Regions:
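Outer membrane beta-barrel
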Residues: 1-118, 125-148, 152-157, 161-163, ...
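Detector for outer-membrane/organellar transmembrane beta-barrel domains
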Residues: 129-131, 140-227
């Protein structure tokens, strides 16, 4: 909802189905659930001199697949190698700055978020000091710009796109299964993703998308992060 030319609010909810989603933290009270209804997004965006400040619960800077949301992926299944920390459905609580140039030719985002908690980790929370999760994403479009923070994996021939992006997340003591030196480590995750879509002469579209992911847990086992 646009309440002012420089202020926007977003509030979305989701309803649990009958599947067992405990592992995805949909049924935990700390995820904001009220009976079968939980808060999916709740954020305010303030536009200040060309910068957008986001505050609340939303998708942190991460890979294109996560920022696509459930309806703009090229395939039905979400990538199993995507293991960035999240409360539920890729979301986290925090604040972020977003900036784009040339209508989306180049854009970047950086934010600090709650990160690893008992709500996003079935084990004992390794980050007992409650350090921030730092998240950033940088995108360059070689062909037509892609405006806005959220992404899509196809424009269905509306424009030619060649986009390359780098995403990075880090949290002190954000990995592990406990709070001792033997069970606790820093979490570092990053990925490179690209999207190429080109209109062809017969009216069709060539589309190619890919990504590479890397995660480091300080050599501390943490199966809730590495899938």
């Amino acid at each position: 909802t646009q309440v002012h030319k420089n202020i926007l609010f977003e509030f979305n909810t989701e309803v649990n189905n009958t599947n067992d989603r405990v592992a995805d933290n949909y049924t935990q009270a700390t995820s904001g659930q009220f009976h079968n209804l939980f808060v999916l997004d709740a954020r305010a965006t303030f536009s200040i001199k060309g910068f957008d400040l986001w505050v609340g619960k939303f998708l942190p800077p991460s890979d294109r697949s996560n920022l696509n949301g459930p309806y703009f992926l090229n395939v039905y299944n979400f990538p199993v190698v995507q293991a960035y920390p999240a409360i539920a459905a890729g979301r986290d609580h925090g604040a972020m700055v977003f900036k784009e140039y040339g209508g989306g030719k180049f854009k970047w985002s950086y934010g600090i978020f709650e990160g690893r908690t008992n709500a996003s980790n079935a084990d004992a929370n390794p980050d007992e000091n409650d350090n921030f999760l730092h998240a950033a994403r940088f995108t360059y479009n070689f062909w037509t710009p892609e405006p806005g923070y959220y992404t899509t994996s196809s424009y269905y021939g509306a424009k030619d796109v060649l986009a390359l992006a780098f995403a990075f997340q880090y949290e002190d003591d954000g990995a592990g299964t406990g709070t001792t030196a033997a069970t606790q480590g820093d979490f570092t995750g990053w990925n490179i993703d690209f999207l190429m879509e080109k209109k062809i002469s017969n009216g069709g579209v060539d589309n190619l998308e890919g990504a590479y992911y890397d995660y480091d847990t300080d050599d501390i086992p943490d199966t809730s992060l590495i899938q």
